[in-house]
Structure formats: structure tokens, C-alpha cells
Amino acid sequence: TSIFETAGVGQPAYATIGAGVVNTVFTLVSVFLVERAGRRTLHLLGLAGMCGCAILMTIALLLLERLPAMSYVSIVAIFGFVAFFEIGPGPIPWFIVAELFSQGPRPAAMAVAGFCNWTSNFIIGMGFQYIAXAMGPYVFLLFAVLLLAFFIFTFLKVPETR
């Protein structure tokens, strides 16, 4: 909700509900696409889309004072970010980890993946407000750079596992 408030959205609670709806819908979309498009392709698409949305969000926040309509662009960027997350980086890593490892080491690999996932979520959740206060409207560029790095890593190192 605070992200929507920063973006100048008049009713941030409704926008937050909208983000939840987008999250749910695109989780279902991912279920149907994963076998057709492939895990690696969806993961790359999701990372690229999230990176683009993070850049769009930065631009919208920078122009918000001069162009109040940028609050709508911010909503589109956030909804797009959530949608691309649910198409790729949300569910796909769990498929990849499960399919990269044979039956014996799979539980340990899944445990390490879960630990890394929840530790990262905790760090972002606890630190975002501080990073946002320090970086201002450029906070989403940090995410864009990280997403670009993850895209390059996935492109170069992660095989298709279906």
C-alpha cells in the first residue's frame, strides 16, 4: 500500500486489492503456460518483464510531480511487475530446482532453495522502506539492475528442465 501511496494513487487500498487479483490470475495463467512454453522461457520472460516494469516505475515516480497522470502509469507498472513475477520468477524456480536434482539430493536442494527464497523475502520486506528513503524514486532501478543480472545468469547458466 505504501508503494501506491508514494505513486500518488488516490485509493491505495483498492490498488493493493487489485495487485492481489493480478497475482491470483497470473498464477493460474502460469499453470497453463508452464508445459507449453517451458520453464526457462517463462522465467526469462518474467525477469525481463519485471525489469521493464521496474524501469517504468522509476520513470513514473520521477515524472509524478510534473505529470499527475503518472500515478496511473505507476499502477500499470506495479500490476505488470506482479503479473510477470507470477508468470516466471514466482513459481518457475520451484520447478527448476525439483527437476535439476535426482531423487536423493532433491529434498536438501528444495530446503536450501526455500531458505534462500524466504531469507530474500525477509530482507526485502524489512529493508525496502529504508532503501526507498535513501534512494527516493530511483529505488526501483536497484531492482532493475538485479533483475537484469538474474536474467543474464538464467540465460547463460540455467537449462530447460522439462
UniProtKB/Swiss-Prot annotation:
Entry similarity comment: Belongs to the major facilitator superfamily. Sugar transporter (TC 2.A.1.1) family. Glucose transporter subfamily.
Posttranslational modification: Sumoylated.
Topological region Cytoplasmic: 35-43, 97-107, 157-162
Pfam families assigned to the protein according to its UniProt record, in alphabetical order: Sugar_tr (PF00083)
Lineage top rank: taxon: Eukaryota
Molecular-function annotations in GO: D-glucose transmembrane transporter activity; D-glucose uniporter activity
Phylogenetic lineage: Eukaryota, Metazoa, Chordata, Craniata, Vertebrata
Function: Insulin-regulated facilitative glucose transporter, which plays a key role in removal of glucose from circulation. Response to insulin is regulated by its intracellular localization: in the absence of insulin, it is efficiently retained intracellularly within storage compartments in muscle and fat cells. Upon insulin stimulation, translocates from these compartments to the cell surface where it transports glucose from the extracellular milieu into the cell.
Binding-site residues for D-glucose, renumbered to this chain: 23, 86, 94
Protein's recorded name: Solute carrier family 2, facilitated glucose transporter member 4
PROSITE patterns: MFS (PS50850), SUGAR_TRANSPORT_1 (PS00216)
Record-linked InterPro entries: GLUT (IPR045263), MFS_dom (IPR020846), MFS_sugar_transport-like (IPR005828), MFS_trans_sf (IPR036259), Sugar/inositol_transpt (IPR003663), Sugar_transporter_CS (IPR005829)
Note: Insulin-stimulated phosphorylation of TBC1D4 is required for GLUT4 translocation.
Location(s), subcellular: Cell membrane; Endomembrane system; Cytoplasm, Perinuclear region
Segments passing through the bilayer: 14-34, 44-64, 76-96, 108-128, 136-156
GO biological process, one term: D-glucose transmembrane transport
Domains (record comment): The dileucine internalization motif is critical for intracellular sequestration.
Subunit structure: Binds to DAXX. Interacts via its N-terminus with SRFBP1. Interacts with NDUFA9. Interacts with TRARG1; the interaction is required for proper SLC2A4 recycling after insulin stimulation.
Keywords: Cell membrane, Cytoplasm, Lipoprotein, Membrane, Palmitate, Sugar transport, Transmembrane, Transmembrane helix, Transport, Ubl conjugation
A GO term from the CC aspect: endomembrane system
Catalytic activity: D-glucose(out) = D-glucose(in)
UniProt membrane topology term: Multi-pass membrane protein
Keyword RNA-binding attached: no
Record topological domains on the Extracellular side: 1-13, 65-75, 129-135
